[in-house]
């Protein structure tokens, strides 16, 4: 498959350079209206009543139509994603920072369990991890690493036997700066390759990964979650779960990436502008969103 050339736009940025004001309550792209107090509006136009989920060392969060309102901590997101059971954190700790996006709250419901996974390099899977990989039924692996990285720590044979392997390199590894996160976002060939997989029904379940499962995987996860309608706070909390695996994180850099997505008109507008077909976006949403049951 031929993809558009790689355009690494190093957008001039200081920590405050994106500058856009942000609504942290249900401001994703699912089309679900949100009241001024953050409550999701129901069909008759009135605001729904929030239901407390409890707080983790802070004031209580609430869930409305599947959404969490501030503050949202990684621990609260762990609780919200427990609906996916043992599949939330995967590979028995053999592959650090590997987890399902299933159960992540959306204004219209939640991310469907068992459809999209994110992780770090798979070289240490071993027999137990290969068993877990098989049990998850993963059909597609999107590798965001460069060819040199993949050659240094190749994925085990069991992954190639079970799943299609798609190389979608984002060539700026190991760098937590805002400018490099944004450059990852603008690696159009990589984003196009990833969404070519995510846009096919037969691709699911899908696993995408980089080396640490943090930076490049974090950018792609943020783009997917914003496209599905997750609020910025939920996206940030999902990203910060990386710290639970012992890896550092760069919240300012992901915030800058989210600002850049908004500057470009939102996740859907950005993806359409670089050539991702509308049908692929529709497939991703259909495969990955479990609506609230009335």
Language model region names:
Residues 1-16:
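Sec-dependent bacterial lipoprotein signal peptides
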Residues 15-79, 294:
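Ser/Thr-rich, Pro/Gly/Ala-heavy low-complexity intrinsically disordered linkers and tails
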Residues 19-24, 68-207, 219-294:
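Cys-dependent protein tyrosine phosphatase-like superfamily
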Residues 212, 216-217:
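Ser/Thr-glycine-rich phosphate-binding loops at phosphate-binding pockets of nucleotides
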């Amino acid at each position: 498959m031929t993809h558009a050339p790689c355009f690494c736009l190093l957008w001039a940025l200081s920590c405050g350079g994106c500058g856009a004001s942000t609504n942290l309550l249900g401001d994703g792209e699912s089309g679900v209206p949100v009241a001024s107090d953050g409550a999701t509006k129901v069909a008759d136009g009135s605001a729904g009543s929030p239901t407390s989920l409890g707080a983790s060392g802070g004031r209580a969060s609430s869930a409305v139509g599947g959404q969490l309102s501030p503050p949202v901590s990684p621990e609260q997101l762990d609780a919200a994603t427990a609906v996916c059971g043992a599949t939330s954190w995967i590979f028995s700790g053999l592959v650090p920072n590997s987890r399902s996006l299933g159960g992540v709250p959306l204004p219209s419901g939640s991310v469907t369990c068992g459809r999209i996974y994110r992780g770090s390099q798979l070289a240490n899977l071993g027999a137990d991890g290969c068993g877990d990989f098989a049990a998850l039924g993963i059909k597609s692996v999107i590798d965001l690493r460069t060819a040199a990285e993949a050659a240094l720590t190749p994925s085990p044979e069991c992954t190639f036997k079970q799943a299609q392997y798609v190389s979608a390199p984002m060539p700026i590894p190991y760098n937590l700066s805002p400018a490099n996160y944004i450059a990852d976002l603008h690696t159009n060939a990589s984003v196009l390759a990833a969404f070519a997989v995510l846009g096919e029904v037969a691709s699911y379940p899908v696993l995408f990964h980089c080396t640490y499962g943090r930076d490049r995987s974090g950018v792609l996860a943020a783009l997917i979650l914003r496209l599905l309608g997750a609020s910025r706070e939920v996206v940030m909390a999902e990203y910060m779960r990386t710290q639970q695996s012992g890896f550092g994180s760069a919240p300012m850099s992901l915030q800058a990436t989210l600002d850049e997505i908004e500057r470009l008109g939102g996740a859907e507008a950005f993806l359409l502008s670089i050539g991702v077909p509308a049908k692929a976006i529709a497939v991703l949403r259909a495969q990955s969103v479990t609506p609230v049951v009335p």
